[in-house]
């Protein structure tokens, strides 16, 4: 039963996950969840070293007033790949902000691959996401974010509302990457070359965990063969890729190719596409 206070204030979903290395096998040793967030039983499509997890949002999407809070901790040497079961939907706001906060701690020798499916902002949605990673020396993190502004398949544009996305990666109190984006829905911003340039989809992929050579950057660029606008550049401790275009499959395919390149180059792992993406 949903009480009146839940309806007025929105959901507050919580997820606390802890992964640990147990003699070369990564296990999910702690799982605390509160609806509408839930994590499926872990599985191991590439042997026990890498634990794959899928996060579910059982309510189907977020509305104004909803809060999602996730804390993910990888203990030393743990290896985890986390994705979501479906695209995240942010519905038209009732005047309140929908907000998601994600805190990650990646200990020495651990690696977290954070690969959520796209976020779809309905016109007039108000949404903010804050993601902070505490990365230990010798740890690595790869993550991406794909956002669609408006249900463009239906011809909808993001002309009202607000989107904020703040990503921070820190190591021993030193910022390795800080990315704060904000877009307010309007006709001008949707069509401006300094906004969306008429393109409803943007994406960012970030790898932090090792110096990237010029050769890797060139290979990353050569993997692109789509119609949208893209860029790839070195960070002090990794790689950044950007996309602006009109096709989710286009950006996703490029990000997957880059992810697989980085896996082979830095993690000594082969291709392993999560099954949930193929559903």
From Swiss-Prot:
Entry-linked InterPro entries? UreD
Q: Give a single Pfam family match.
A: UreD
- For this protein, what is any one GO molecular function term? nickel cation binding
Q: Which UniProt keywords apply?
A: Chaperone, Cytoplasm, Nickel
User: Where does the record say this protein resides?
Assistant: Cytoplasm
GO CC, one annotated term: cytoplasm
Q: Which HAMAP family match?
A: UreD (MF_01384)
Say what the protein does: Required for maturation of urease via the functional incorporation of the urease nickel metallocenter.
UniProt family annotation: Belongs to the UreD family.
**How does this polypeptide assemble, per the annotation?**
UreD, UreF and UreG form a complex that acts as a GTP-hydrolysis-dependent molecular chaperone, activating the urease apoprotein by helping to assemble the nickel containing metallocenter of UreC. The UreE protein probably delivers the nickel.
Q: What is this protein called?
A: Urease accessory protein UreD
């Amino acid at each position: 039963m949903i009480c009146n206070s839940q309806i007025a204030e929105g959901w507050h979903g919580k997820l606390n996950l802890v992964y640990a290395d147990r003699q070369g096998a990564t296990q999910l040793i702690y799982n605390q969840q509160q609806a509408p967030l839930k994590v499926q039983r872990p599985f191991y499509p590439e042997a026990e070293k890498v634990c794959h997890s899928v996060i579910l949002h059982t309510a189907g999407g977020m509305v104004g007033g909803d809060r999602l809070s996730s804390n993910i901790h990888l203990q030393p040497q743990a290896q985890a790949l986390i994705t979501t079961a479906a695209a995240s939907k942010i519905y038209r706001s009732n005047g309140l902000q929908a907000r998601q906060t994600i805190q990650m701690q990646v200990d020495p020798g651990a690696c977290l691959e954070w690969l959520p499916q796209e976020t779809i902002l309905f016109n007039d949605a108000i949404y903010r996401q804050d993601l902070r990673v505490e990365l230990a020396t010798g740890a690595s993190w790869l993550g991406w974010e794909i956002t669609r502004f408006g249900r463009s398949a239906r011809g909808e544009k993001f002309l009202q509302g607000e989107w904020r996305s703040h990503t921070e990666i820190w190591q021993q109190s030193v910022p390795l990457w800080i990315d704060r984006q904000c877009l307010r829905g309007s006709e001008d911003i949707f069509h401006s070359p300094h906004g969306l340039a008429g393109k409803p989809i943007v994406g960012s992929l970030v790898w932090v965990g090792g110096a990237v050579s010029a050769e890797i950057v060139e290979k990353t660029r050569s993997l692109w063969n789509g119609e949208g606008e893209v860029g790839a550049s070195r960070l002090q401790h990794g790689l950044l890729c950007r996309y602006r275009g009109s096709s989710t499959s286009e950006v996703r395919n490029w990000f997957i190719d880059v992810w697989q390149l980085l896996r082979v180059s830095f993690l000594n792992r082969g291709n392993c596409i999560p099954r949930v993406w193929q559903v």
